[in-house]
Amino acid sequence: MDILTIGEVLIDLTQTGKDARGIPQFAANPGGAPANLAVAASRLGAQTAFIGKVGADAFGRYLKEVLAENKVDVSGMAVDADHPTTMAVVSVDATGERDFSFYRSANADVMLCKEDISDEALKAAKIVHFGSVSLTADPSRTATLDAAARAKKLGATITYDPNYRANLWKNKEDAIAQMKAPLPLVDILKVSDEELPLLTGTTDCESGTAQLAQNGIRLIFVTLGANGVFYRFGEKTGHVAGVPCKVGDTNGAGDTFFGAALSKLCKEELDTLTVDKLEGILAFANKAASITTSRHGAIPAMPTLAEVEG
């Protein structure tokens, strides 16, 4: 297995427009950052698996089907009979930027337990990936951190996306503390230009990533929206330009970027990776993200390998 992702899969109720009376219209799309990444990487040629928890309901069954249809191994997905599948309402403004409202108190994804994540699954993966949404509450917080620590000991490369959603946390201070907690376990980190100052206190990519690298993180990406990506690879830093596109909806763009990058990095060794090779991978990831951004929804918008290479 190339990439195992752990965390939330949920229903994104994504605004698609308004009717003649001005009432917003919504589509029920599959979402959740770790699930998004698993699909993005799978469509681009990687073998991926997802571990998370859904409710014993129609949405839960639908999400499992969508992941399986996209060749994501869902044998590790758990079903919770007592808690419903999580939903988020995603409103999109005229520029394509998103606003999230989560319906998530005591929902299935938060109920992921240590026992739901086997050593066998962790041992089989080259890369084990997670985000911070599963760190917002227990038992999923303890389960996710425990899995990352176990995977690290078993030799996996650990990747992490803080993926800050303000309305999922008690307050900003708690969010920052919990988002920082896994950093010493992480080999490859992706943050947005909005998350960098939360974690480091600075908007400067050079000094911010230098600070993050003190945790032992070997490769750091700072996504800059339409402006591409800044990277720190050991002592080397650089920038790879974005790919211009007409914005439809930015939902899933960051997950597509990271999934695309990891679909290539899972075939490389960080010890022997060159800067030229890395920049080629990031150009590929930027193109994949631009295609997603030009469409609507997260998983439905993600490109195939032929579309990115074409």
Descriptions of predicted regions:
Residues 1-73:
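Glycine-rich phosphate/adenosyl-contacting loop at the front of the ribokinase-like
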Residues 2, 157, 188, 218-219:
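Proline-centered loop/turn at the N-terminus of a beta-strand
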Residues 3-4, 149-150, 201-310:
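Conserved phosphate-binding/catalytic region of the ribokinase-like
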Residues 39, 87-91, 228-231:
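Short beta-strand scaffold segments in enzyme catalytic cores
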Residues 47-130, 310:
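Conserved N-terminal subdomain of the carbohydrate kinase-like
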